[in-house]
Regions:
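Conserved beta-strand/loop scaffold segments within soluble protein domains that form the structured core
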Residues: 3-10, 104-363, 377-379, 383-403
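Long, low-complexity, mixed-charge
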Residues: 1-108, 115-117
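Extracellular glycan-modifying ectodomains
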Residues: 368
């Protein structure tokens, strides 16, 4: 048994340090062997509509590459532009001998039972690489799709942006309209090489009884840029994630922004950590959380290890239900003289004067609250295709209705 397998075996029962603990045996590993689908013909109109809500357009047009995994099977995978490589991770590991060195390098296999399960019972996942100097104008679209009720999906993704390259990935994670429960475990390791740029947009559109456990590590080298956008607007049972970005090279930059809604019965424990290890690195972490009756823990952690670093953390939350709970947990850790780090955190309700101001201009109370909520959740995400931008705007509009 390899050392990695042994570590996974020893940690297979270890609960995560944060978030709601799960019984992994409560979920199923049985599901149909879905056929490969080069033309997306197996997807009914209802499925297509559901996938679009997670940003997945089911077309190879205007995409530099596409990847779709249904349960345990990769059903579509294609690179459509020179300079981009898109493969299932198992195939990529067989093709590139050195890729194994990137596996479990940024995320510890023995972090908890979820990382262990991803190693011991891996389904697949994606490998996406932008070749040196490639300027990839159109996004790569990746979808992780639970199509069978109660299925436990385990994926491991690796993204490499080679020196001087630029890449945008849009990942949609969702379920079949008929699926009510299940578990998604997703390990992701991103490498942004010297002078490279990666924008990663993740949109979740799960079902009400789905549990989600992403585990993400990012390494950004000298002069590199990593932009992360995370959107969760629809009901889910629980999400626990705490991605860590390491700015390892001088002048590296990251911006992490997220918007999420905790619906009744939902438990979210989400956040982001940035470790600034080199001079002139910069980081910005922005979170917008809204509780409609669910529980949300919004975390942020900035670690400045050397002088001449600058970072800001902003956590804002709105509670719109008597049953709603939001915890904002900002942390600043300065380990050297000359760091410049700040945070701003606010949790509360909509001020009465804001509602009165809008009502004085002709809106009724419900319309006024809805308008304020839409403005609170509206965060500009760069590089979205028009159809996806319209769908995201529509989802934000819907989230403000009936409050």
């Amino acid at each position: 048994m390899s050392e990695i397998k042994a570590l996974a075996e020893r940690s297979a029962a270890n609960p995560a340090a944060l978030g709601h603990d799960l019984d992994l045996e409560a979920f199923s590993r049985e599901g149909p062997a879905w056929d490969y689908d080069p033309d997306y013909r197996q997807f009914a109109p209802e499925e297509r509509s559901h996938l679009l809500k997670a940003g997945i357009e089911l077309t190879d047009e205007e995409h530099a590459g596409t990847f779709l995994q249904a349960d345990a099977r990769v059903v579509h995978c294609r690179a459509n532009q020179e300079g981009v490589e898109v493969l299932p991770i198992i195939e990529a590991l067989a093709k590139h001998e050195d890729l194994a060195d990137h596996l479990w390098h940024l995320v510890a296999v023995d972090a908890d039972k979820y990382t262990a399960r991803a190693e011991l019972a891996l389904d697949n996942g994606y490998f996406i690489r932008a070749l040196p100097g490639a300027q990839v104008a159109e996004p790569v679209e990746a979808c992780l799709y639970i199509k069978t009720d109660r299925f436990s999906q385990h994926v491991h993704n690796i993204v490499i942006v080679e020196p001087g390259a630029s890449l945008h990935i849009i990942t949609g994670c969702t379920t079949h309209p008929g699926v009510r429960s299940g578990l998604h475990i997703g390990v992701s390791e991103f490498y942004v090489r010297r002078g490279g740029s990666l924008t990663f947009t993740m949109i979740h559109n799960w079902a009400e009884d789905i549990h989600v456990r992403p585990r993400t590590g990012v390494l950004v080298e000298e002069g590199g840029r990593f932009i992360s956008n995370y959107v969760l607007l629809r009901p889910v049972k629980s999400v626990q994630m705490y991605p860590t970005v390491t700015l390892a090279g001088a002048g590296a930059v990251t911006r992490m922004q997220s918007i999420f809604i905790a619906h009744p019965g939902c438990e979210l424990d989400v956040g982001g950590r940035v470790i600034l290890k080199a001079p002139r690195t910069r980081a910005e972490v922005i979170a917008r959380s809204l509780s409609l009756g669910g529980r949300c823990v919004s975390r942020g952690h900035l670690v400045g290890e050397v002088p001449e670093v600058k970072a800001h953390l902003e956590c804002r939350g709105l509670i719109l239900s008597p049953q709603g709970v939001i915890y904002a947990v900002p942390e600043l850790e300065g380990l050297a003289a000359g760091v410049d780090m700040s945070h701003e955190a606010a949790v509360g309700r909509i001020a009465a004067e804001e509602i009165e101001y809008l009502m004085a201009r002709g809106l009724d109370e419900e319309e006024a609250v809805s308008t304020i909520v839409r403005g609170f959740l509206s965060v500009k995400i760069e590089g979205l295709p028009p159809a996806l931008e319209e769908e995201l705007d529509r989802a934000i509009q819907e989230s403000g209705k009936g409050l």
